[in-house]
């Protein structure tokens, strides 16, 4: 496995590769990330994992400075998994001058996560587009855990005619249903025991819909009330069309239930995809 930190060296290393798969990450890797690595290895001759904590997607009051950075352990795990290249650019590598150009995003980027974290998706898409230009992969792997992000990146690729196929990896969960996330490291033992309640409530909505319930606002409100009663502060719970991310209607068959909520000072997000027959 090679660890590369500069763009020129990476391009030289990749120039003769028949096919390249990219797995963009912010590090602090867990089984969810590693499942994406396995998918990448099935789709290309060379697997590149990038590690970059993207300052652009953090608001000033958010956790950029304390976001877990575990580069040594990350590289050990990736070597065990047979990754070919780990690309770890510094901030000056990706942003040698102030970033003046950014994408104009569609309205969906201002809803849900975008409404709670203004500028988040602009920061995400800027760095993802940079990575696509640098690595020039044929395939890139993103997790369904960040469902709205996945859909926005798919739109970016389609509408900008980028020559890369986006493949989604399923959310990996702990035994109690909690979606694996780097921010789970913030949870203490008591919080960890409660953390799966968000996933359980999203799943409960999905089960109600699968059983024939179509009063989506009532299902959303009931889940929010249950979480609030258990000490959570909910940003949103919303039933959406799974591709457009517009509010779902009773006629839709492809759905996703998305949620974000605070457990004390820790913000968790999750989703529950649902396809009705």
UniProtKB/Swiss-Prot annotation:
Pathway the protein acts in: Cofactor biosynthesis; (R)-pantothenate biosynthesis; (R)-pantothenate from (R)-pantoate and beta-alanine: step 1/1
Localization: Cytoplasm
Residues involved in beta-alanine binding: 57
Enzyme class: ligase
Gene3D superfamilies reported in the protein's UniProt record: HUPs, Pantoate-beta-alanine ligase, C-terminal domain
Binding site for (R)-pantoate: 57, 149
Binding site for ATP: 26-33, 143-146, 172, 180-183
Enzymatic reactions: (R)-pantoate + beta-alanine + ATP = (R)-pantothenate + AMP + diphosphate + H(+)
The protein's assembly and partners: Homodimer.
Comment field (misc): The reaction proceeds by a bi uni uni bi ping pong mechanism.
Protein name: Pantothenate synthetase
Organism: Nitrosomonas eutropha (strain DSM 101675 / C91 / Nm57)
Gene encoding the protein: panC
């Amino acid at each position: 496995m090679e660890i590369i930190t500069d763009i020129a060296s990476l391009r030289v290393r990749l120039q003769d590769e028949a096919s390249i798969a990219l797995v963009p990450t912010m590090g602090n890797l867990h089984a969810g990330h590693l499942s994406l690595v396995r998918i990448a290895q099935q789709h290309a001759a060379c697997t590149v994992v990038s590690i970059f904590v993207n300052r652009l997607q953090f608001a000033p009051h958010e956790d950029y400075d304390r976001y877990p950075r575990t580069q040594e352990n990350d590289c050990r795990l990736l070597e065990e998994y047979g990754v070919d290249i780990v690309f770890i650019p510094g901030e000056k590598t990706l942003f040698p001058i102030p970033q003046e150009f950014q994408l104009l995003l569609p309205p969906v980027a201002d809803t849900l996560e975008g409404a709670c974290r203004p500028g988040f998706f602009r920061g995400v898409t800027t760095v993802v587009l940079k990575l696509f230009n640098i690595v020039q992969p044929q395939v890139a792997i993103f997790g369904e855990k960040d469902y709205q992000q996945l859909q926005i990146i798919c739109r970016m690729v389609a509408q900008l005619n980028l020559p890369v196929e986006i493949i989604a990896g399923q959310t990996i969960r702990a035994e109690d249903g909690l979606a694996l996330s780097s921010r789970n490291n913030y949870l203490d033992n008591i919080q960890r025991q409660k953390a799966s309640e968000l996933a359980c409530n999203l799943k409960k909505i999905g089960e109600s819909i699968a059983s024939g319930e179509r009063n989506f606002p009532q299902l959303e409100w009931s889940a929010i009330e249950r979480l609030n009663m258990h000490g959570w502060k909910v940003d949103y719970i919303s039933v959406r069309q799974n591709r457009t991310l517009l509010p779902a209607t009773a006629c839709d068959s492809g759905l996703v239930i998305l949620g974000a909520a605070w457990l004390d000072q820790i913000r968790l997000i999750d989703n529950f995809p649902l396809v009705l027959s």
